[in-house]
Amino acid sequence: MNQLDGIKQFTTVVADSGDIESIRHYQPQDATTNPSLLLKAAGLEQYGHLIEDAIAWGKKHGGTQEQQVAAASDKLAVNFGAEILKSIPGRVSTEVDARLSFDKEKSIEKARHLVDLYQQQGVDKSRILIKLAATWEGIRAAGQLEKEGINCNLTLLFSFAQARACAEAGVYLISPFVGRIYDWYQARSPLEPYVVEEDPGVKSVRNIYDYFKQHRYETIVMGASFRRTEQILALTGCDRLTISPNLLKELKEKEEPVIRKLVPSSQMFHRPTPMTEAEFRWEHNQDAMAVEKLSEGIRLFAVDQRKLEDLLAAKL
């Protein structure tokens, strides 16, 4: 049995890609997209029809060019998501514009709009996860959306405070970023030789997983942003793992046994009183890595969103 199939025995495997051909090849349960992945996929010739449809939608929407671009951008994200859903049995994650990361109300409005666009294409909201950055405002927006039956995936998650606040808000799923945590520490204090058990990104997800299970939070933990297969194998047993096509390929090519590393704890603890906004901001702010990586992640997604909009504007 190859390692990918071995992991699938214990963990739901999710494809971290906007490339539909890769998704079909590796047969994941779910798929995640973001502006960076959509920008990459939009440059591939085989997806030209999805872009043309989004452009036509933008023109039909009318208004200023800026409004047409915004409409086309939302439609493109939904077009890719709907196309991906034809190749997977589960859900696709579609991201809310990162520039709304500090605006609860506009994030809610955008999420409802994306769900509406999906429903116009015959896709039920039970097959969609709305991705939001795990800022305080993003977490509050997700809490409201969950009450409306719109499940959310909280991304750019780097601190324990972010994870705990998401669980307390009743968020459906979180995506703690293993690789970007590893990158930050590796640039400052390289782990040499590399020992996966000491990898700060792996340790972060393990701690979150254990805490959620010990306190009976139903929020799904989906490890994300991997740099090497060792990180993935060390988190086998995590609820879900979202993996890029290049690492899915590596795992599929290795014929080695896979051992489950994460197992729900039998120890149970009472849940603490939910964090206030002040407590969340203080706790998150104590983690220099998390503060830096969250703000950087939002900026980078916003840059790629603008590039995607420029690509669409040139065609309108």
Curated annotation (Swiss-Prot):
<feature type="active site" description="Schiff-base intermediate with substrate">
    <location>
        <position position="131"/>
    </location>
</feature>
<dbReference type="InterPro" id="IPR004730">
    <property type="entry name" value="Transaldolase_1"/>
</dbReference>
<keyword id="KW-0704">Schiff base</keyword>
<protein>
    <recommendedName>
        <fullName>Transaldolase A</fullName>
        <ecNumber>2.2.1.2</ecNumber>
    </recommendedName>
</protein>
<dbReference type="InterPro" id="IPR001585">
    <property type="entry name" value="TAL/FSA"/>
</dbReference>
<dbReference type="GO" id="GO:0005975">
    <property type="term" value="P:carbohydrate metabolic process"/>
</dbReference>
<dbReference type="GO" id="GO:0009052">
    <property type="term" value="P:pentose-phosphate shunt, non-oxidative branch"/>
</dbReference>
<comment type="subunit">
    <text>Homodimer.</text>
</comment>
<dbReference type="GO" id="GO:0004801">
    <property type="term" value="F:transaldolase activity"/>
</dbReference>
<dbReference type="Pfam" id="PF00923">
    <property type="entry name" value="TAL_FSA"/>
</dbReference>
<keyword id="KW-0808">Transferase</keyword>
<dbReference type="InterPro" id="IPR013785">
    <property type="entry name" value="Aldolase_TIM"/>
</dbReference>
<comment type="pathway">
    <text>Carbohydrate degradation; pentose phosphate pathway; D-glyceraldehyde 3-phosphate and beta-D-fructose 6-phosphate from D-ribose 5-phosphate and D-xylulose 5-phosphate (non-oxidative stage): step 2/3.</text>
</comment>
<keyword id="KW-0963">Cytoplasm</keyword>
<keyword id="KW-0570">Pentose shunt</keyword>
<dbReference type="InterPro" id="IPR018225">
    <property type="entry name" value="Transaldolase_AS"/>
</dbReference>
<dbReference type="GO" id="GO:0005829">
    <property type="term" value="C:cytosol"/>
</dbReference>
<comment type="function">
    <text>Transaldolase is important for the balance of metabolites in the pentose-phosphate pathway.</text>
</comment>
<comment type="similarity">
    <text>Belongs to the transaldolase family. Type 1 subfamily.</text>
</comment>
